[in-house]
Amino acid sequence: MTKIVNSWNEWDPLKHVIVGRADNCCIPPAEPATDPKIPEGSDMQDVHGPRSEESIDKANIQLDNFSRLLEKRGIKVDRPTPLDFNQKIATPDWENGSMFGCMPPRDVIITLGNEMLEATMSYRSRWFEYLCYRPLLESYFNIDPEMKMESAPKPRLTNESYRENYLSEDISIDERLEMVAKKEFVTTEREILFDAADILRMGKDLFVQHGFTTNLKGSDWLGRHFENHRIHTLNFPGDPYPIHIDATFTPLKPGLIINNPTRPLPNEQRDIFERNDWHIIDAAQPAHNEPPPLCYSSIWLSMNVLVLDPKTVCVEESEVYQCEQISDLGFEVVPVPFRDAYPFGGALHCATTDVYREGKMEDYFPIQ
């Protein structure tokens, strides 16, 4: 029997992974879910259309280099099949001027045990993105008799799924933070919504960020679907744009997490970690004062690292402070040039999704 799919956490030895591509990537036109994500003064405002061939080529050079680096370490690498993202898409409820891309598979696919699950996604522009990964998932399904290929309920993403005029230009940053603290986000509870990158896998326990891209119904659905697991919903009030957990809260090995110091986990949500002797420490400061041009993400992609095993971590090579911190914590740091790929969907964790890690499901939080 050929075993292809197995991954229970973020740190066991990685043996097989999907690395994204930048081909055909677009900046989609405005839609209800994306407007609140773009910070004031960002060069992303009012910009949409295909990304330049020059920027795509630079990103692909770094993605290809990353893939070769992983392969040299004995890790099998698969790549998605890009679509023509620069085309209009539609459902019976809406139409959108273009799609996004397939650089960040972590957003779309979550692997848990022998299952690979397609997330609902919360952007209209990303509704069809799962198609880029279907050929790979189908091949795993055909080879591995125990692999489960699943898809969460596709959302309609009508206007009822979003708060109207959320975070208008008249709202100050303090007011934005107050709304986030109250857990008032752009997405409503109209239907089940979650992005896979809002989920951290820690054996029997899954930690899910409630924010712009995952709602409480999404967390509830995950708990019902993964019925042998425990779901914990987290939120980080210091983040005015809470999208995806992996530039905020990053486990490096059992018992150790780095936390974005500008988005600290609230004290009342720390209990489960403290009861089980987990240490949450502030991540190092980013090496850059600004993200690259036309980048959705913040400078905190510095902590968006890929753990290869409990002793080895890939870090973007220019993020010297994060490299130094992780080295001082006792890890081998593998520096990876990746900043040209940031604008296409994130850093090293975003750009990958697990297929196979050694290990089995363990209970890292026995004291609930």
PLM segments and residue spans:
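The feature marks the mature, well-folded catalytic cores of soluble enzymes
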Residues: M1-Q368
